[in-house]
């Protein structure tokens, strides 16, 4: 392990920002420990790294790329973008394997969106087996563990963190080229847990942020970008969802959510992150999500599908282009 990995491994997944680490002499005693759910355990327990970190690293050793889908604002289409992104990559790369992990613990929607609502997770000797949507696309969600889709999950942070830890250590993903994680809105327990665990795994990882054009959404996405920078999460870029409405009859574009301050593209320029592209609003997409149908197959000629292809290409470029080579080439050219 590198020194950075050791530092990360010495902090619980639900630790506060300035946690001294479980191996520190001030563990459970520092001012940053006040209010932490682990304070008493750290103060009295043996000093050492969180064993879950090594477990996660081992379990995900065959997962090449991890994609966090984030947004500070709810209702902007994170789950829809997660489903579209994973389906598109799986269909365009039939010889590769993809997985979706739904860590929106209190509002799991991927089972419905991906058309496997009501399926059950099976236990094997190597852990939980994810539910397969296609031969090369699988899903794990707490939605599969509920007795009814109407059941409410009323959990505090530590229990959510424990569930995410369980997903990352007990699901038998096998070899994956991409694992796409659907997250809840905000910058809270689920995001901290996922970032803490993923940052020490092998391979590449990064965050795709989703927004809509209006300022009320951009305001929270700016905070999410700041969160990523503070947590050292590589930012793949920003997707502007529901950017325009394209009339299916005459192809005329209408701004349903007018961008008052330049929209996501201007925000990306200001905050120095990549603008991945915009997805037009299509009512047929909402219908497909509700019914668990594959929008890409049902409406292959939609402007949304055309735009999605460009976004998928840019996401895969981030993970599969040798960044060191690109940097060196850029320096030579300049």
From Swiss-Prot:
Entry cofactors: [4Fe-4S] cluster
Compartments it resides in: Cytoplasm
Keyword field contains 4Fe-4S: yes
Superkingdom to which the source organism belongs: Eukaryota
Gene Ontology biological-process annotations: iron-sulfur cluster assembly
Main location as per UniProt: cytoplasm
Alphabetized InterPro entries for the sequence: Mrp-like_CS, Mrp/NBP35_ATP-bd, NUBP1/Nbp35, P-loop_NTPase, YlxH/NBP35
GO cellular component: cytosol
Keyword list, A-Z: 4Fe-4S, ATP-binding, Cytoplasm, Iron, Iron-sulfur, Metal-binding, Nucleotide-binding
Residues binding ATP: 72-79
Binding positions for [4Fe-4S] cluster 2 per the UniProt entry: 247, 250
Residue positions binding [4Fe-4S] cluster 1: 19, 33, 36, 42
GO MF assignments: 4 iron, 4 sulfur cluster binding; ATP binding; ATP-dependent FeS chaperone activity; iron-sulfur cluster binding; metal ion binding
Family per record: Belongs to the Mrp/NBP35 ATP-binding proteins family. NUBP1/NBP35 subfamily.
Subunit structure: Heterotetramer of 2 NUBP1 and 2 NUBP2 chains.
Protein's job: Component of the cytosolic iron-sulfur (Fe/S) protein assembly (CIA) machinery. Required for maturation of extramitochondrial Fe-S proteins. The NUBP1-NUBP2 heterotetramer forms a Fe-S scaffold complex, mediating the de novo assembly of an Fe-S cluster and its transfer to target apoproteins.
Name this protein carries in UniProt: Cytosolic Fe-S cluster assembly factor NUBP1 homolog
Native organism taxonomy: Eukaryota, Metazoa, Ecdysozoa, Arthropoda, Hexapoda
């Amino acid at each position: 392990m590198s020194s950075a990995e050791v530092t990360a491994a010495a902090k619980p997944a639900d630790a506060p920002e300035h946690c001294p680490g479980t191996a520190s002499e001030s563990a459970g005693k520092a001012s940053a420990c006040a209010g932490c759910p682990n304070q008493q355990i750290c103060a009295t327990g043996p000093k050492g790294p969180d064993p879950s970190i090594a477990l996660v690293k081992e379990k995900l050793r065959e997962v090449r790329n991890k994609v966090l889908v984030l947004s500070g604002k709810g209702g902007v289409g994170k789950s829809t973008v997660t489903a579209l992104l994973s389906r598109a990559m799986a269909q365009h790369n039939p010889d590769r394997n993809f997985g979706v992990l739904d860590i929106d613990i209190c509002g799991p929607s991927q089972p419905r969106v991906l058309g496997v609502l009501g399926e059950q997770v099976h236990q094997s000797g190597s852990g939980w087996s994810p539910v397969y949507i296609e031969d090369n696309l699988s899903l794990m969600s707490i939605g599969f563990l509920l007795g009814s889709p109407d059941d409410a999950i009323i959990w505090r942070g530590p229990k959510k963190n424990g569930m995410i830890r369980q997903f990352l250590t007990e699901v038998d993903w096998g070899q994956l080229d991409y694992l796409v994680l659907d997250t809840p809105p905000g910058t809270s327990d689920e995001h901290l847990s996922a970032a803490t665990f993923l940052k020490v795994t092998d391979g590449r990882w990064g965050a795709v942020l989703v927004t809509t054009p209006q300022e009320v959404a951009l305001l929270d996405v700016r905070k999410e970008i700041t969160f990523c920078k503070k947590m050292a999460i590589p930012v793949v870029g920003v997707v502007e969802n529901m950017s325009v409405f394209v009339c299916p009859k005459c192809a005329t574009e209408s701004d349903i959510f007018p961008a008052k301050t330049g929209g996501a593209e201007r925000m990306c320029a200001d905050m120095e992150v990549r603008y991945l592209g915009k997805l037009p609003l299509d009512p047929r997409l909402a219908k497909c999500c509700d019914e668990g149908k594959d929008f890409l197959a049902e409406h292959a000629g939609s402007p949304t599908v055309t735009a999605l292809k460009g976004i998928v290409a840019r996401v895969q470029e981030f993970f599969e282009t040798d960044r060191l080579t690109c940097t060196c080439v850029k320096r030579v050219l300049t």
